Amino acid sequence: MFMFEKPYGMRDSLPGLYETKKKVRHSLTEVMNGWGYRLMETPTLEFYDTVGVQSAITDTQLFKLLDQNGQTLVLRPDMTGPIARVAASKLHEQAYPLRVGYAANVFRAQEREGGRPSEFEQVGIELIGDGSISADAEVIALVVFALKNAGLNSFKIAIGHVALAETLFVDVLGNTERANVLRRFLYEKNYVGYRQHVKQLPLSSIDKTRLLQLLELRGGREVTERAEEIVVSQEGKEVLAQLKSLWETLEDYGCTEYIRLDLSMVSHMSYYTGILFEVFADHVGSVIGSGGRYDQLLAHFNAPAPATGFGLRLDRLLEALDVKEINEPQEAVIFSKEQRLEAFAFAEKERSKGKKIVLQDLAGIENIDAMTKAFEQVTYFIGARKGEQNG
């Protein structure tokens, strides 16, 4: 029946799942706090003309509504835009760099056939005001330490750079319009289509080889050395130098076993300007997190500053962890009016020991057998008798 249905893409979190999410969320934010990132909240609703327009999420995926003054609002589609707004308006007088974190639900309209959630929780951080490679490395290393603290050990972080493929495409093809065709193949990870398209282009065999070799630039630090064979522009060489420096810093963090370079990586997030990365875990078909540098976003809020950060999908992380829902044992105290005072005192004493105690008046139970089966232990305070335990 309609009364039991939810809007498309929305999900319930029943008690067991809720407790599991709470535990995993804490394991992530614990590391974030330990690295000096202070958690904050922003409104669920934002103005479309500010956060909505600046979001990298496509307009068709935004949930829009009108307020009583006729202004268009959006349910926040991500957290980077809202935090950029706050940094520009409320935190701009604080000394940079700023380190802030969040754990919040975001909203994106989905096609009915896609089967994806329209509401999901992101846990992440933003490092604002530091444009160095060291800041990029800190953010990526924090992902590694946070995921390990959550209990995930089988994962990889693929790292790329926005400008590498772009400079190669423009250098070979001559303009961004032609480059956009190849970029779309990479974004969709349609490598077969990419190869077929390159082979049909009216280019020299040398230039075709350069474009095709881009797909092979995946692996460890040696990838940057192989890339020098196809990257000839000064901007491209500077990108490779950044990636080498990033790798060296991540080596010092002790993180490189979880890292691989993928120089063919592109992103649908239009605000990324430099290093970008995606997090993959075994047995999960989609990325469980992503991040990167977005040095131009805060300028749209009249507070230009470099920034980098990441967001992890809590639902996909739970899938990767493959953890059972938490159903902690509970005990019940069933009482009648005659021993209510004793029952209350007993329950408080047990709660002080860290136990979860449900107090239930006998008068409010319709089926005592069904009710008591849900509990690990039941203690009775009924009639004139003292407590009688039935475990």
Swiss-Prot record:
What are the recorded Gene Ontology BP terms? histidyl-tRNA aminoacylation; L-histidine biosynthetic process
**One Pfam family named in its UniProt record:** HisZ-like
Keyword Nucleotide-binding set for record: no
Q: Where in the cell is it found?
A: Cytoplasm
Q: Which UniProt keywords apply?
A: Amino-acid biosynthesis, Cytoplasm, Histidine biosynthesis
Give the UniProt entry's GO cellular component terms.
Answer: cytoplasm
Q: Does the keyword Transport apply?
A: no
Family assignment from sequence similarity: Belongs to the class-II aminoacyl-tRNA synthetase family. HisZ subfamily.
Q: How does it assemble?
A: Heteromultimer composed of HisG and HisZ subunits.
Q: What else is known?
A: This function is generally fulfilled by the C-terminal part of HisG, which is missing in some bacteria such as this one.
Tell me what this protein is called.
ATP phosphoribosyltransferase regulatory subunit
